[in-house]
Amino acid sequence: MASGNCTTPTTFILSGLTDNPGLQMPLFMVFLAIYTITLLTNLGLIALISVDLHLQTPMYIFLQNLSFTDAAYSTVITPKMLATFLEERKTISYIGCILQYFSFVLLTVTESLLLAVMAYDRYVAICKPLLYPSIMTKAVCWRLVKGLYSLAFLNSLVHTSGLLKLSFCSSNVVNHFFCDNSPLFQISSSSTTLNELLVFIFGSLFAMSSIITILISYVFIILTVVRIRSKDGKYKAFSTCTSHLMAVSLFHGTVIFMYLRPVKLFSLDTDKIASLFYTVVIPMLNPLIYSWRNKEVKDALRRVIATNVWIH
């Protein structure tokens, strides 16, 4: 953590989204509203799935964990970002930065793997409907969830351990609104070659394995659906996948742009906008995407409201 006369900084200074004083309060209000909506919708969906027996199915177990991941994702990033709009000196402690980085990497991989597992669940439900209850049992679902959390944890541990070995002698100003790897590597006075290689290898491994699983699942889903004769059957099959495909496109599209694009296209300012999208905006959109046209979720919400009204 230290080399020669270099001492590890006790704090980092975050540059934030903008240094324009006139934009600080408007941006604070906008992102406070987004964060509030994110928490209310994701925690609301978690609670709804927990209390409604009709939603105790594999698809909603995974959706519940996706909502938890999104709520945690937003909470790791947004509160500190909101604070930077109100503080003249936008600081984060060294330990706070490391913890934020660890949590961010953990949740990014968790979401990626969850989207892959959800695609596999849809594949089994549509392509093997008779075997679905025996294949996707609750025990299997929770083993998959625990497995992907474990993989994400180990991956985050590797990257965070590498970050702890870096020295920051020349600067402690992070050109970002949170502690991400690219701006931290940029100000490191140590060689970051190994760190960058690990980010690329593990990032590619998890992203591509998730994307390949999703693509293969949907190839089989499409081949099965086109053989369904009734229009209602086709519509029902596709409608269960539309929300998931939207979530996959938003998340993986942004992550691929962020971490797997050519070096010549790299720009920290561009990264800020892309990071803002998948750390703040997507966690707000996901519960809306999954519940907006979902009849089962709407029916469950009506049942819960009706029960509470009847009790009172």
From Swiss-Prot:
GO MF annotations in UniProt: G protein-coupled receptor activity; odorant binding; olfactory receptor activity
Known function: Odorant receptor.
Organism: Gallus gallus (Chicken)
Entry keywords, A to Z: Cell membrane, Disulfide bond, G-protein coupled receptor, Glycoprotein, Membrane, Olfaction, Receptor, Sensory transduction, Transducer, Transmembrane, Transmembrane helix
Principal cellular location given in the protein's record: membrane
UniProt superkingdom: Eukaryota
Glycosylation sites: 5
CDD domains to which the protein is assigned, alphabetical: 7tmA_OR5D-like (cd15410)
Subcellular locations according to the entry: Cell membrane
Cystine pairings recorded for this chain: 97-179
InterPro entries assigned to the protein according to its UniProt record, in alphabetical order: GPCR_Rhodpsn (IPR000276), GPCR_Rhodpsn_7TM (IPR017452), Olfact_rcpt (IPR000725)
Protein name according to UniProt: Olfactory receptor-like protein COR4
Annotated Gene3D superfamilies: Rhodopsin 7-helix transmembrane proteins
Family from the record: Belongs to the G-protein coupled receptor 1 family.
PANTHER family with a match to the protein in the record: OLFACTORY RECEPTOR
Ranges in the topological domain labelled Extracellular: 1-26, 80-100, 165-205, 261-271
GO cellular component: plasma membrane
Spans within the Cytoplasmic topological domain: 50-57, 121-139, 227-239, 293-312
This protein's record includes keyword Transmembrane helix: yes
Residue stretches spanning the membrane: 27-49, 58-79, 101-120, 140-164, 206-226, 240-260, 272-292
Gene: COR4
